Amino acid sequence: MKKTAIAIAVALAGFATVAQAAPKDNTWYTGAKLGWSQYHDTGFINNNGPTHENQLGAGAFGGYQVNPYVGFEMGYDWLGRMPYKGSVENGAYKAQGVQLTAKLGYPITDDLDIYTRLGGMVWRADTKSNVYGKNHDTGVSPVFAGGVEYAITPEIATRLEYQWTNNIGDAHTIGTRPDNGMLSLGVSYRFGQGEAAPVVAPAPAPAPEVQTKHFTLKSDVLFNFNKATLKPEGQAALDQLYSQLSNLDPKDGSVVVLGYTDRIGSDAYNQGLSERRAQSVVDYLISKGIPADKISARGMGESNPVTGNTCDNVKQRAALIDCLAPDRRVEIEVKGIKDVVTQPQA
């Protein structure tokens, strides 16, 4: 039995890689175990009777899972009380100890691991006999364990384990120096295994806001009648307009300058005049800093009059020129996409 136990422990020691059924990284666990404890190599002075080597064993343990590969475990073991009888001496031996081991594992399935524990035990062994009375001894012995662990839930796991402890006692002090093998069934509770909070997908970015701005300037302010050269007053008006355009700062913006005339004169002449006036405005705004590829001119001639038929009965030329003044205009259309800024959620 001893050789079999050692062979199992040595074989399991090779499986020292990631255990998927292990607790989450950097978490604690605690548990308890109960099982069959058997003492080996029990030699007692003056004892020629039966020795009850098989006893009930139990223990409690706690551990810390560093990462999927390695954990550390500390526990208390009650290895059992072993009575013995002989023709001269009758008594009992009992042992208990505190152990510290490194726990290494290997995944079989998502929920099942093979593991091994390697470390040492600080033990105390006591004897009581009708001949020598009470004696005790303390010491440190190596501990080897191997087993399988099954995760019932993320928090609760069960394990089946065989543990071997070498040389518990001093034959000169308590009359024996046995080894111990314990087969146990344990249950553990793992802390901090709750499901991670679901990741809430960020709200989709709001659709960009497309904005269009319109500005209208009177041609009589910009130009002399029947001319396409900007007046100083016209330049001053465009300076103010440029400041407004700069404040808009649209993303991917474009500026269209539309020139209009009144109905006095031929269609062809008015079309050409409206184009020249629109281009004069464009050239000036480019000189102020608007990119040339973002602004264009378009002559609209005498189309889209704003006066309608209000001037139809005006016959004198000077009066008609004054009446049709609203038709002589320059319209500036700014199109662009404005970035929508949302406030972060609290």
From Swiss-Prot:
Positions marked as site (Part of salt bridge gating mechanism): E73, R159
Effect of R190 to D/N: Protein is hydroxybutyrated
Observed effect of gene inactivation: Double lpp-ompA mutants are spherical and only grow in the presence of electrolytes such as 30 mM Mg(2+), and are sensitive to hydrophobic antibiotics and detergents. The peptidoglycan layer is no longer attached to the cell outer membrane which undergoes abundant blebbing. Decreased efficiency of bacterial conjugation of the F plasmid. Deletions grow poorly on SDS, cholate, at pH 3.8 or at 5 M NaCl. Grows very slowly in the absence of NaCl, wild-type growth in 1% NaCl. E.coli is no longer killed by human neutrophil elastase (ELANE) in vitro.
OmpA-like domain span: 210-338
Renumbered ranges of Sequence repeats: 201-202, 203-204, 205-206, 207-208
Disulfide bonds: C311-C323
Outcome after substituting G86D: Becomes sensitive to phages K3, K4, K3h1, M1, partially sensitive to phages TuII*-6, TuII*-24, K5 Ac3, Ox3, TuII-26, Ox4
Annotated spans, Required for dimerization: 209-297
Signal peptide extent: 1-21
Keyword check for Transport: yes
Region of interest called Hinge-like, as start-end residue ranges on this chain: 197-208
Primary site of residence: membrane
PROSITE patterns for the chain: OMPA_1, OMPA_2
Protein family according to the UniProt entry: Belongs to the outer membrane OOP (TC 1.B.6) superfamily. OmpA family.
Protein's name in the database: Outer membrane protein A
Gene: ompA
